[in-house]
C-alpha cells in the first residue's frame, strides 16, 4: 500500500477474517488519525496518546511524559495523497491472477514473487513494482520439497494455507495454517508439503 495516505480496513464478508500486515523498514512511525476519529474518541471518554496507546479517561489519567493526540489541522490534512481506484489497482495482486506468474522451483514447489526481487539470495521479477523495504514471496504446492534455502536477512514464514514442514539442520517443525515462523539467519532450510490440494506459504524477508 502507498504511504502518506489514509486507509481503513473492514471485513466485508460473513466469516472471521485475517489480514497479515507487513510494515516496511524497522520503524513503522506514529499513526496519523483522521480528525473525526480523535473527536469521536474524546466524546466517548477515550483518549489516544502520542505513543499510540488508548486509555479510558473515566478510569485513568494521562501518564506523565505522555500527551493527548490532537486532531491535525486542515492545512496538514491537505498534504496527504489521494488516489483514484484505478491508480491503486497497480498495487494489488489478485489471487486469481497469481497463476500467471508462477515459477517452477523444484520437486512440485512453485514460487510467486509478489513484492521485491529477492528470494533466498536469488533474483526474480516481482508482480508489484513497489519499493517497500521487504520481499514478499509465496511458495505454492500440493506435494513437494525444496531444500537448501538460505536467508541472510531477517525472514519470517507465514502459512496462508496448509500444514508445511520446515527442517533446519536435524530439527523439523510443523507450520500449520495461520502459523508464523521467524527463521534463523544464514542456516540451510528445507520446506516440504504433502496435501491433496494447493497450499500456500508466505515468505517475507528484509530487502
Predicted features by range, described:
Residues 135, 145-147, 153, 169, ...:
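Short, solvent-exposed loop/turn positions at domain surfaces
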Residues 10-11, 125-130, 145-152, 157-158, ...:
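Short histidine-centered beta-strand/loop micro-motifs
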Residues 1-3, 169-187:
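Short acidic-glycine-tyrosine-enriched beta hairpin
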Residues 48-140:
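A short, N-terminal "cap"/entry segment at the start of jelly-roll beta-barrel domains
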Residues 6-86, 190-207:
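Double-stranded beta-helix
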Residues 6, 163-165, 188:
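Structural motif
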Residues 8, 21, 136-140, 156, ...:
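Conserved hydrophobic/aromatic beta-strand scaffold that supports enzyme active sites
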Amino acid at each position: 500500500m502507498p504511504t502518506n495516505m489514509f486507509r481503513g480496513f473492514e471485513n466485508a464478508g460473513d466469516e472471521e477474517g485475517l489480514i497479515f500486515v507487513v510494515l516496511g523498514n524497522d520503524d513503522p512511525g506514529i499513526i496519523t488519525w483522521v480528525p473525526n476519529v480523535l473527536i469521536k474518541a474524546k466524546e466517548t471518554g477515550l483518549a489516544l496518546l502520542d505513543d499510540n496507546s488508548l486509555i479510558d479517561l473515566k478510569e485513568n489519567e494521562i501518564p506523565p511524559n505522555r500527551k493527548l493526540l490532537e486532531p491535525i489541522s486542515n492545512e496538514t490534512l491537505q498534504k496527504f495523497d489521494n488516489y483514484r481506484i484505478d491508480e491503486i489497482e497497480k498495487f494489488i495482486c489478485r489471487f486469481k491472477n497469481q497463476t500467471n506468474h508462477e515459477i517452477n522451483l523444484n520437486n512440485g514447489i512453485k514460487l510467486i514473487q509478489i513484492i521485491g526481487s529477492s528470494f533466498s539470495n536469488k533474483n526474480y521479477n516481482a508482480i508489484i513494482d513497489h519499493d517497500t523495504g521487504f520481499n514478499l514471496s509465496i511458495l505454492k504446492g500440493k506435494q513437494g520439497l525444496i531444500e537448501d534455502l538460505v536467508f541472510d536477512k531477517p525472514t519470517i514464514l507465514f502459512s496462508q494455507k496448509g500444514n508445511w514442514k520446515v527442517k533446519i539442520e536435524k530439527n523439523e517443525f510443523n507450520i500449520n495454517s495461520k502459523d508464523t515462523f521467524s527463521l534463523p539467519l544464514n542456516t540451510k532450510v528445507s520446506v516440504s508439503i504433502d496435501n491433496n490440494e494447493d497450499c500456500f506459504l508466505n515468505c517475507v524477508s528484509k530487502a
